[in-house]
Amino acid sequence: MNIKPKKYKPIKEEYIKSFKDMLLLRRFEEKCGQLYGMGEIGGFCHLYIGQEAVISAVELIKKKGDSTITSYRDHAHIILAGTEPKYVLAELMGRATGCSKGKGGSMHLFDIPNKFYGGHGIVGAQVPIGTGLAFAEKYNGTNNICFTFLGDGAVNQGQVYEAFNMASLWGLPVVYIIENNEYSMGTSVSRSTFMRDLYKKGESFGIRGFQLDGMDFEEMYNGTKQVAEYVRENSFPVILEVKTYRYRGHSMSDPAKYRSKEEVAKYKERDTLVRIRQIILDNKYATEEDLKAIERSVQEVIKVAVEFSENSPLPSEDELYTDIYV
């Protein structure tokens, strides 16, 4: 297969939905950063600010029954998978009402009813699991696929290639999405891997790979839709490398001194949220007042999430002895 340029384009309703989704993710992550600074969120906290177009486009393409798994930068993925933001924020704040009962925190978010399987803190560990999820779909004879997200740093992990080999050997319906935000923690791609075209990493296993502009919502939508169709019809893996960028540090404790202000500013000029907003206005899909109303509704969701989390109890001591399997 080859990705055809502009074969698919979002319709009006999809543009508006994705604008609302991206805005919700942006405001949610900004609030998380604020609460972390206030000491309301502890431990590790990895924000997704700047990368919103990637998951927003994928969620439009996903069909009911498809599954998602990702790394520790997972707030956006679980929210768009269907988990209410208040349960995600409660988890970040260590409350019993959180999606992982307050025991997982930022890096270990789960929502099995919505087929979101984590949230994994070990770099690359989710890739073999995502491959296993795809195996289950094939074994059970469904037409579902698994979207397995990983970062550019995870591509250097050995288990990733073991998973690639099994996925191609058994013909598994999995889309590996490499969110290449240029840095593995503080190490640039150019310093961490010899072959910088990460979408080619599956060639030895017969896996086709494609590179998309993760800052371009329309390109993400078009490319992901074609790839998902191929994987669903042929039950064979594909790798998507999406070139994106995080505006904040690797985590909240990272001042990101390894990159210049000019570099960050260059990427912010292509801010996906600003661009999709302008597309909507230029095509008269919505008015300025319509978009302001969406902003107000998003702010209300964030307000409710904060109030819910602050008023939720901490887990009881008995929870120390539940959900233990080894």
From Swiss-Prot:
It catalyses: N(6)-[(R)-lipoyl]-L-lysyl-[protein] + pyruvate + H(+) = N(6)-[(R)-S(8)-acetyldihydrolipoyl]-L-lysyl-[protein] + CO2. Keywords: Oxidoreductase, Pyruvate, Thiamine pyrophosphate. Its cofactor is thiamine diphosphate. One of its GO terms (molecular function) is pyruvate dehydrogenase (acetyl-transferring) activity. The gene is pdhA. This is Pyruvate dehydrogenase E1 component subunit alpha. GO terms for cellular component: intracellular membrane-bounded organelle. Its EC number is 1.2.4.1. Pfam families: E1_dh. GO terms for biological process: pyruvate decarboxylation to acetyl-CoA. The pyruvate dehydrogenase complex catalyzes the overall conversion of pyruvate to acetyl-CoA and CO(2). It contains multiple copies of three enzymatic components: pyruvate dehydrogenase (E1), dihydrolipoamide acetyltransferase (E2) and lipoamide dehydrogenase (E3). It comes from the Bacteria. InterPro entries: DH_E1 (IPR001017), PDH_E1_Alpha_Subunit (IPR050642), Pyrv_DH_E1_asu_subgrp-y (IPR017597), THDP-binding (IPR029061). NCBIfam families: PDH_E1_alph_y. It comes from Rickettsia typhi (strain ATCC VR-144 / Wilmington). Heterodimer of an alpha and a beta chain.
